[in-house]
């Protein structure tokens, strides 16, 4: 089944911070690299003011699609609705250049869409035969006999521990004897024109697959869910495309369009939606992105499957298509999601010529789980989707069986659901080398600078070089030969054919036939006219002359993709121009105002049962007796764990009903944003015995806080904890039990199972192996120190070495530990010598005594060595084999310390004594102030840091070795600190992660700001020269109010990133505008006091920033400037009735970003747009408008003010203003807002020039 990929011309919309202009322009200004000697598409807020209906449509799309839906058809067969017996012309006009193809020019880039194109079907195909004579009158095609191998059915069987031998032939008995029939006479229709060709391009009879009765599929596993799917004949939805232009595109290891299989994932998030998952992925694609998401209702493809994604680790990414299953919560939705996934997987396998082959049990095949990749290939440590599937009483084997069945149905090997038999089997979509189909086409294309050349026939092995690049041509035919697709391009105006080009060598767009019109428009002087619609800089017919708007008389119109182009005359010059540059001079016909829909009430209440737990934040809105209360009552029940029994939604607010965990006492309703919430499963009774360390805290509730301690474990040595109850909170297990007469809850992480001989348990033959990756198969950077035991198993150069080398020479010595890796059931660490620099090898941790190693801290102190001491050592915590001076040699001497470090609970000092340097335990020294391991009291500390080390951990308690969790998912995200504590010279911060959980993190894993530097590959002189040489010169005000052309030195000074980065205010032009900072709602509301309708809208700005990935301050500054600090009528709201603005209506529509508020009538146009978008509250206008802003420059790659102004990736193109100080002015404004809010910018992206 062939994928139909098309291109579109989106309007890239940008909103200025200074001067409220809305700018729209053609895609070539935004997406293509242009001739940089003269700027063809530089935009200025003073020059262009119109936007397009395309931008409006994008705002309403719930998944931010840049396209519609995708239809899969067969890439090898195109079946005709018309079979014209015309003879093709083999000798096309060859306007080619025999020189080599110029590969130096950068290729055009174009945004893509997937507007569905009907694919006609053919009942006959022809294959090449090298010894067939071909006449000049026909295409250079050859003929061959059709080989029908489909009668021998070989269904794909599930790989499992025991495969039934008889399954291989279960479908063969039903295979009919081949019969030969004549092709039916073709009907002639207008479109689409599709012709199949023989050697003479005449219709012929072919061996057709006979009508036959197909066998029904025999399931290989029992599955009530699969039976439900079959019984209800569930249909998969159309595949939607939601591609993102800034995702990277890299080939698989075997090349573009050559994946080796598909991987099953699940999102591991019970509370997310498919839109939420996609939005989160787009904002964090640098960490991971996948090809598609599937839930019970939709299949959304988020990245082209011809290119790899980052979803399954370094080994699997270059091989497989990655698809995520979004969690559903009821039987029917889960069944639909499995049906949708199986259908999508079978479609991909069929499309890429792959057969279903489970890799689950042998590590070989085309259908993988993430667990299988972790187990057999490595590079990742995940075990999904088995846990999620088991939670629905489903398994991977059942899903694979469904994929296999879907594939066989699509291949025409078994009967579809709901039928006893079927007609001719559908043609397998694996391309057959040599089969050709040709179809009529009505489109346009531009040949990229780097291409394979022009082909006289599609059978030519190589193309001839051409200079006809970066020009728009008409496309008259499409041909598919095997897995290669070609377009026949011709001169748009004369029809002269140039030749065939490969699909990948062009930027293609659909086109409708031109229509005659008779319409007058006004057009600005300087606007370019082109010889063809969607013309390029090489096809300019002239520019509009005169001063002031001129009259353009249009006589022809054509739609290219979704853009309209008109052909006409102005001041004696004729040519094509985009309708976006024209203004209709005719009096507009009033459009009837649609009957306003009933606004959604904000008082609609929904209540549902819930089983969870929550802790009320210290800062909160209080407890509510009912969710209708306007204000809550203050409460002291903060930072305690309560049970949650219900959740309620009222308008835009969500509440939880909290109660005492151990009694039926209700506490009250709390707002969702005022708690840290976790899912909880119902408690279950257990009878288990564990050991627990003395001092371990017991709590009155699971996931209890310091305010809910029930006591601490007493005694010496491990104590016996008898558990009687167990409950899962989120992903953690808590047990209730008794130890030494005290009862309470404790996390399972603090318990150990007493050693006991294991009883062998007989397993049924059909048992499925447990799907748990016990330890991460990744290497972690650590800071530890270890002593090698005398009796050890040896040293390894790699953890993969089965046999270790003798480690006797390392025994009884201390070494630094820098790396740690789990391999199988064993854990290994990498030892380094005492200089830290040279790795020695890997030891099993069982052969070592290991302690944490702190950070070295400088000190200047004199000490007296105690009479009884352990000597001067080469390394902290050194053994007798590493002593430099014995205890007798340094006793009573003076030790001059220069640095110190903590080893576990001890402190060692490095210094000099008797002209020798080394380490001494602090316990062996006496000083005026004794050096001891210190733990300072935790103190309040409010600051938002950025997590910079994805390989680090966050902790439940500081310095804990057990209760720690990876920071990988939170890397480069904000961390709001509320407390600080120093333990053994290590500073720890306690605060809130981006998911709302509270944790401790080391200061070394945090940064005050995250600055990334990107190399441009050009010098500052080069880019300044390009900017200074533009047709529309950069502007500067040397005298206030008077604009003049900036010279080279002015431009170079304005673009100097090194200078700008040193200025505390100008540095903000490098602030990433596509990265929210999680600024607290309280701070935002304080800043918005007195700002008109924007007052108290902090929650809306916070939601908008998180939902669409936009910096909060950038959004706020936009809104303040557009609305005059929240006081404009557009912001305060109005209605449009009978095409007139009504400001006193009951329902008002708000527009706080000035979207679509065109200069000719900004209030009416802006309110009309808000009404269409449904923005009947200020908060809706904020959130909805943020999506519009996010889809403009911010998401188009120009995500800083500097990039908007100077576009360092493609200097001189797609730039936002001509004023060289534009970025400086706006940087100072944003810095000023940050200062008023009391925050600083966290994420900066600075270009660097050579």
Curated annotation (Swiss-Prot):
GO terms for biological process: cell wall organization; peptidoglycan catabolic process. It catalyses: Hydrolyzes the link between N-acetylmuramoyl residues and L-amino acid residues in certain cell-wall glycopeptides; an N(4)-(oligosaccharide-(1->3)-[oligosaccharide-(1->6)]-beta-D-Man-(1->4)-beta-D-GlcNAc-(1->4)-alpha-D-GlcNAc)-L-asparaginyl-[protein] + H2O = an oligosaccharide-(1->3)-[oligosaccharide-(1->6)]-beta-D-Man-(1->4)-D-GlcNAc + N(4)-(N-acetyl-beta-D-glucosaminyl)-L-asparaginyl-[protein]. Residues 103-151, 173-219 are annotated as: Disordered. Residues 437-511, 513-587, 606-680, 682-756, 778-853, 855-930, 937-1011 form the GW domain. Undergoes proteolytic processing to generate the two extracellular lytic enzymes, probably at the septal region on the cell surface. It comes from the Bacteria. Disulfide bonds: none annotated. GO terms for cellular component: extracellular region. Residues 199-769 are annotated as: N-acetylmuramoyl-L-alanine amidase. Residues 173-196 have a biased composition (Low complexity). InterPro entries: Amidase/PGRP_sf, Amidase_domain, GW_dom, GW_dom_sf, MGlyc_endo_b_GlcNAc-like_dom. Residues 103-138 have a biased composition (Polar residues). Residues 770-1250 are annotated as: Endo-beta-N-acetylglucosaminidase. Keywords: Cell wall biogenesis/degradation, Hydrolase, Multifunctional enzyme, Repeat, Secreted, Signal. In the N-terminal section; belongs to the N-acetylmuramoyl-L-alanine amidase 2 family. Endohydrolysis of the di-N-acetylchitobiosyl unit in high-mannose glycopeptides and glycoproteins containing the -[(Man)5(GlcNAc)2]-Asn structure. One N-acetyl-D-glucosamine residue remains attached to the protein; the rest of the oligosaccharide is released intact. Cleaves the peptidoglycan connecting the daughter cells at the end of the cell division cycle, resulting in the separation of the two newly divided cells. Acts as an autolysin in penicillin-induced lysis. The GW domains are responsible for directing the proteins to the septal region. This is Bifunctional autolysin. It comes from Staphylococcus aureus (strain MSSA476). The gene is atl.
């Amino acid at each position: 089944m062939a994928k139909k990929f098309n291109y579109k011309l989106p309007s890239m919309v940008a909103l200025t911070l200074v001067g409220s202009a809305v700018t729209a322009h053609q895609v070539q200004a935004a997406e293509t690299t242009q001739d940089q000697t003269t700027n063809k598409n530089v935009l200025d807020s003073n020059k262009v003011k119109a936007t397009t209906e395309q931008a409006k449509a994008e705002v309403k799309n719930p998944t931010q699609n840049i396209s519609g839906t995708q239809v899969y058809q067969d890439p090898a067969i195109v079946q005709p609705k018309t079979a014209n017996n015309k003879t093709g012309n083999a000798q096309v006009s060859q306007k080619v250049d025999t020189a080599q193809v110029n590969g130096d020019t950068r290729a055009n880039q174009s945004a893509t869409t997937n507007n569905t194109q009907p694919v006609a079907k053919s009942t006959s195909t022809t294959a090449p035969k090298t010894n067939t004579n071909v006449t000049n009158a026909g295409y250079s095609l050859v003929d061959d006999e059709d080989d029908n191998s489909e009668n021998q059915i070989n269904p794909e069987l599930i790989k499992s521990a025991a495969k039934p031998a008889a399954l291989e032939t279960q479908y063969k008995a039903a295979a009919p004897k081949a019969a030969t029939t004549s092709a039916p006479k073709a009907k002639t229709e207008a479109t689409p024109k599709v012709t199949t060709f023989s050697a003479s391009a005449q219709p012929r009879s072919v061996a057709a697959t006979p009508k036959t009765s197909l066998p029904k599929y025999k399931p290989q596993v029992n599955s009530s869910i699969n039976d439900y799917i079959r019984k209800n004949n569930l249909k998969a939805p159309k595949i939607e495309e939601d591609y993102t232009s800034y995702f990277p595109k890299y080939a698989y290891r075997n090349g573009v369009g050559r994946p080796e299989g598909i991987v099953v994932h699940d999102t591991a998030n019970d509370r997310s939606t498919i839109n939420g998952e996609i939005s989160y992925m787009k904002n964090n694609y640098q960490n991971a992105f996948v090809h598609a998401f599937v839930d019970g209702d939709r299949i959304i493809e988020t990245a082209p499957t011809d290119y790899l994604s980052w979803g399954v680790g370094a080994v699997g990414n270059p091989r497989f298509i990655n698809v995520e299953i979004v969690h559903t919560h009821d039987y029917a939705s889960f069944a639909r999601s499995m049906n949708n996934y199986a259908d999508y997987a079978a479609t991909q396998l069929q499309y890429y010529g792959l057969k279903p082959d489970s890799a689950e049990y042998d590590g070989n095949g085309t259908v993988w789980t993430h667990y299988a990749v972790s187990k057999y290939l490595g590079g990742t440590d995940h075990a999904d989707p088995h846990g999620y599937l088991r939670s629905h009483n489903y398994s991977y084997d059942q899903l694979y069986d469904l994929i296999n069945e879907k594939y066989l149905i699509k291949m025409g090997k078994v009967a579809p659901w709901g039928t006893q038999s079927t007609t001719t089997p559908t043609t397998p979509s694996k391309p057959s080398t040599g089969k050709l189909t040709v179809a009529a086409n009505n489109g346009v294309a531009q040949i990229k600078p780097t291409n394979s050349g022009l082909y006289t026939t599609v059978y030519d092995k190589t193309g001839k070089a051409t200079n006809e690049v970066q020009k728009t041509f008409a496309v008259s035919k499409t041909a598919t030969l095997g897995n290669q697709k070609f377009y026949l391009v011709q001169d748009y105006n004369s029809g002269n054919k140039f030749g065939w080009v490969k699909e990948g060598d062009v930027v293609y767009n659909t086109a409708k036939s031109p229509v005659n019109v008779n319409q007058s428009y006004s057009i600005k002087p300087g606007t370019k006219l082109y010889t063809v619609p969607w013309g390029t800089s090489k096809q300019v017919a002239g520019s509009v002359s005169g001063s002031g708007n001129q009259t353009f008389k249009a006589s022809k119109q054509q739609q290219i993709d979704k853009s309209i182009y008109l052909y006409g005359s102005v001041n004696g010059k004729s040519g094509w121009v985009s309708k976006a540059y024209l203004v209709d001079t005719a009096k507009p016909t009033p459009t009837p105002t649609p009957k306003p829909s009933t606004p959604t009430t904000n008082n609609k209440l929904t209540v549902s049962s819930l089983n969870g737990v929550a802790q009320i934040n210290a800062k909160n809105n209080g407890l509510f007796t009912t969710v209708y209360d306007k204000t809550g009552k203050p409460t002291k029940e903060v930072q305690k764990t309560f049970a949650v029994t219900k959740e309620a939604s009222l308008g835009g607010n969500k509440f939880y009903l909290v109660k005492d965990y151990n009694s039926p006492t209700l506490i009250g309703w709390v707002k969702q944003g005022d708690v840290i919430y976790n899912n909880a499963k119902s408690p279950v009774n257990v009878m288990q015995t564990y050991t627990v360390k003395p001092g371990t805290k017991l709590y009155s509730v699971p996931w209890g806080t310091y305010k809910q301690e029930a006591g601490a474990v007493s005694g010496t040595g491990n104590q016996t904890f008898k558990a009687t109850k167990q409950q899962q909170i989120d992903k953690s297990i808590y047990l209730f039990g008794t130890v030494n007469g005290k009862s309470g809850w404790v996390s399972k992480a603090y318990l150990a199972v007493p050693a006991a001989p294991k009883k062998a348990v007989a397993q049924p033959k059909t048992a499925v192996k447990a799907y748990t990756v016990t330890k991460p198969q990744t290497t972690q950077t650590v800071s530890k120190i270890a002593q090698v035991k005398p009796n050890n198993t040896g040293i390894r150069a790699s953890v993969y070495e089965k046999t270790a080398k003798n480690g006797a020479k390392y025994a009884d010595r201390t070494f630094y530990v820098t790396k740690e890796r789990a391999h199988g059931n064993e854990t290994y660490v990498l030892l380094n010598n005492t200089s830290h620099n040279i790795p020695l090898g890997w030891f099993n941790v069982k052969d070592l005594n290991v302690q944490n190693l702190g950070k070295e801290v400088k000190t200047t102190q004199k000490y007296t060595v105690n009479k009884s001491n352990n000597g001067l050592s080469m390394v902290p915590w050194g053994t007798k084999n590493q002593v430099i001076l014995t205890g007798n040699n340094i006793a009573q001497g003076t030790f001059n310390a220069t640095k110190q470090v903590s080893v576990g609970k001890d402190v060692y000092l490095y210094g000099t004594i008797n002209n020798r340097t080394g380490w001494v335990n602090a316990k062996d020294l006496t000083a005026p102030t004794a050096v001891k391991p210190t733990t300072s009291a935790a103190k309040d500390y409010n600051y938002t840091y950025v997590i910079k080390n994805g390989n680090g951990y966050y902790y439940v308690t500081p310095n804990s070795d057990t209760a720690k969790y990876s920071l990988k998912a939170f890397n480069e995200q904000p961390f709001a600190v509320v407390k600080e504590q120093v333990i053994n010279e290590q500073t720890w911060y306690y605060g809130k992660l981006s998911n709302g959980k509270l944790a401790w993190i080391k200061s070394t894993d945090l940064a005050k700001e995250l600055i990334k530097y990107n190399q441009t590959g050009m010098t500052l002189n080069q880019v300044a020269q390009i900017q200074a040489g533009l047709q529309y010169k950069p502007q500067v005000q040397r005298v206030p109010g008077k604009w003049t052309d900036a010279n080279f030195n002015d431009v170079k000074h304005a673009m100097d990133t090194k200078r700008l980065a040193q200025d505390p205010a100008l540095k903000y032009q490098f602030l990433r505008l596509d990265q929210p900072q999680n600024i607290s709602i309280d701070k935002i509301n304080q800043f918005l006091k007195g700002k008109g309708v924007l007052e108290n809208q902090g929650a809306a700005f916070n939601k908008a920033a998180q939902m669409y990935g936009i910096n909060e301050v950038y959004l706020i500054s936009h809104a303040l400037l557009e609305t005059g600090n929240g006081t404009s009528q557009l912001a305060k709201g109005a209605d449009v009735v009978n095409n007139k603005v009504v400001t006193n209506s009951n329902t008002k529509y708000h527009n706080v970003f000035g979207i679509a508020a065109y200069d000719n009538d900004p209030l009416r146009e802006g309110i009309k747009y808000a009404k269409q978008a449904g923005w009947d509250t200020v908060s809706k206008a904020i959130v909805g408008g943020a999506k519009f802003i996010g889809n403009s420059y911010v998401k188009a790659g120009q995500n800083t003010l500097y990039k908007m102004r100077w576009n360092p990736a493609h200097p001189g193109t797609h730039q936002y203003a001509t004023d060289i100080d534009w970025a400086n002015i706006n940087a100072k404004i944003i810095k000023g807002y940050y200062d008023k809010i009391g925050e600083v910018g966290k994420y900066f992206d600075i270009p660097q020039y050579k």
